[in-house]
Amino acid sequence: MHGCGELFVRRIFAQRQFSLFESVGEQAEPDELFRTVRDPNPEVGAETLKMACELAERLEYPIVFVNDPDADRLAMCERIEGKWKFFTGNEMAMIYLAARIETMFTTSSGVGDPKCLDDDSNSNISNIFYSTVSTMFPKTICQFLNIEHRVKVSETLTGFKYLGEKVLEAQLRGERTLLAFEESLGFLVSDHVYDKDGVSACLAFAELANTIYTRASTFNAYLTQLQEKYGYHLTFNKYYKVQDMSKVIPLMDRIRDWRNRELSNDSTRSLEDYPAYLGSISSSPSPPSSDDQYKVTGVRDLTVGFDSNYEDNKPRLPISENNQMITFYCGSKFVLTIRASGTEPKLKFYLEKVLPGTIFTDGTFASYESAIGVLRDEALDIMDGLLEPKKNQLLPGF
């Protein structure tokens, strides 16, 4: 996308003899003005990928890959029944991980002896690393297949400086990494690279496409198959623009001191200091039992160094007083993280809810869009309760 990636993607595709490859001529060369798009960020989706999709339609190609200008991220979309499906970073990670894990650890009769994909690796231990605001799918699939003793799943703070460091540490232990990723379309698919790389990721997904399409399937069909098997990992990640940055710390402090206990320096922080429930009922002393799905069962606050998920209440991830970040757990299948951006005047939130794979066949939802719509409504209700956007002049970036 008006950057450095096209030359290298074309080169590696030629080496792998992928002949059905065409690039958008108007966007193939570096252009610091990004003349053909309003925003070269591939996360924007349809608008940014429009020219590539139009070219694919003319050529009758079903898949589009797009790198951002510095080619460290990869976006992907697929034409399904005449419409383009834009995959999120979480969905792409699910597809790639499941394909690798199921190839390594499953047979037609179920879980079997691992079949190593990497001929040059003697490691018996594999790793998956992901940022703490990305999907929990790696944990889900490893628990489902009972391979946690062979595949270690680890969270890091946001940023590939943390993910890359973990990949290097694993390599020094003689262990392989299956994938390191962030929800924002950042992927590290090789032990030979210690940062997100859209070029090697593009090759990896192209090779996977070759395998999937050879089986007369599609990325979207495979994703649906995974969700029906392992559960629908629905996510809603958005942000509020902050007009007055001086309000950020008081807003986050209000959440962590919800009970107005006025902790002193020698006081012991506990789960009771935070909201007991999420949503518009968060301030109610006796929420209705029907809202138990929003009952907070755990909190991790990396700003003050608190994590109720451990007996000592100490987080295992690094803490920083300069980074505002709180995560709420409502059971094991509902997670919300709120954090202040370190580079922009934004308060970001990341919500994930895991639902059974039968939600469409049992009539719970009529469509995937309706399920996401309900999640969106839940997210906005929760944010209204915690952040009071109108009162605090927070502008929704969605």
Located regions from the model:
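Generic detector of well-ordered alpha-helical packing
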Residues: M1, P69-R73, E183
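Well-ordered alpha-helical segments embedded in enzymatic catalytic cores
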Residues: E47-M51, M92, Y96, Y162
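Short, acidic/turn-prone active-site loops that include or flank metal/cofactor-
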Residues: G25-E29, N90-A93, L157-K161
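N-terminal small/polar loop signature for handling phosphorylated ligands or for N-terminal nucleophile
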Residues: V9-M76, L168
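Glycine-rich, mobile lid/loop segments that gate access to catalytic sites or pores
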Residues: M1-C4, V133
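Gly/Ser/Thr-rich active-site loops/lids in small-molecule metabolic enzymes
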Residues: L20-S23, K83-E102, S200-A204
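Phosphate-binding and adjacent anionic-ligand microenvironments
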Residues: E57, Y61-I63, N67, K83-K85, ...
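Short Gly/Thr/Asp-enriched flexible loops that form oxyanion-binding sites at enzyme active sites
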Residues: V9-F13, D72-A93, P138
